[in-house]
Amino acid sequence: MRWGGGSSALGDAVARPRDDRQRDLLRPALEEIIDLGHPLVRLAREIDWGFLDQRFAGVCTPGPGQPGLPTRLVAGLFMLKHMHNLSDEVLCARWLENPYYQFFCGELSFCHRLPFDRSSLTHWRQRLGEEQLVALIQESLSVAHKTDALTTRDLERVVVDTTVQPKAIAHPTDARLCHRALEKLVDLARRHDVPLRQSYRRIAKRAAIMVGRYTHAHQFKRARRALKFLRIRLGRVIRDIRRKIAGNEALQERFASLLALAVRVRLQDHRQRGHKIYALHAPEVECIGKGKARAPYEFGCKVSVITPATKPKGGQFVLHAKALHGNPFDGHTLAPVIAGLEALTGVETRRIHVDKGYRGHNHAQKFRVWISGQVRRVTAPIRREMRRRAAVEPVIGHIKAEHRMGRNYLKGRDGDRTNAALAAAGYNFSLLLRWLKRLLHSLIRALLVDPASRQNA
């Protein structure tokens, strides 16, 4: 069974991938040196690589040019990376020494050298984007259905919740941001041979350190004085650079973005309402408060996660995951994410269970949404499902701790959306690995049972 459809948009111009890998006659085939009952081997045979090739082909253009990497290689690398929580560097090292990784990615003979450059992973992430990479989630659900780990009924009753996907940034403080803005401006001016009257690097570093020390000692008046000293020096550097590059359009264009960020950092205050700059390299980062005692505020973007409200045999799969920017109210995200889920799976959602943060939601079918603590219209079966609402919390914890959603290193808002989709797909495929291993163990136990004892049973 294949769920959903999905459209693809053209990305960078690249020739259609061509998988013309052949077996090396001087080396043994991978199938001859690995255990064909290994869960990775069984999972590779269950995945419909042709479907992924069809979806990923949307970013390719027919015509001359070097063909892109094989789709199975690209998709397999992304799956392995997020299944086992690996960085790009560690993934490449593991791939070279692990024959199961190579078989999973479609190699026929053992490779002693990488058939791709490590930077290709970054290029393909940017080229595919969320719209194509969500096909990995779709394929994971299709494999789960084929192996009886998930049923169509599990898609009709769902739990929706949101979490924060933190960005890889340092904890933002006014002093740190002002100091970093000054350093970046001075470095950029030096690279473009723009002479400055004074760089203030040494005294700015000292002032930033003293702000932290005074704050730690509860000497807030001195801390404010040191922060004011730092802001004045940052303003001097900004004005000096503007004077020196006046009339030079090339330099003005090069300095424009950093100068705009530096001005915002200099003027913003910790009491200021609305969007602020929390990292110079990631200005899209938002401050989100979830009411946690250990982390009152988190810096990243909001992500909506949907899981079944039932108990699938293979575990609590992630049915849909999407990054949401602008720190929207949870209730206003319900209608679009449910529409995205139904488009992905092709199954109409009949019951939706949410927490109290979704009160005042915008879903059109009000009577299909059940809010935690609701009393009216609650029957015994629905009450049992409402008790399952909290099952989404450990799923979110596993995705963040074990599948690279806990700290997002990808750049920009596109990186937020890409990482959310890949983390959900990696979690689903890890559940499938465990499910296939359980099936294999059950088969072995059934074969090892004595026929006489089986008849007595």
Language-model segment annotations:
Residues 38, 75-77, 88-92, 117-121, ...:
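Short, conserved catalytic/metal-binding motifs centered on acidic residues
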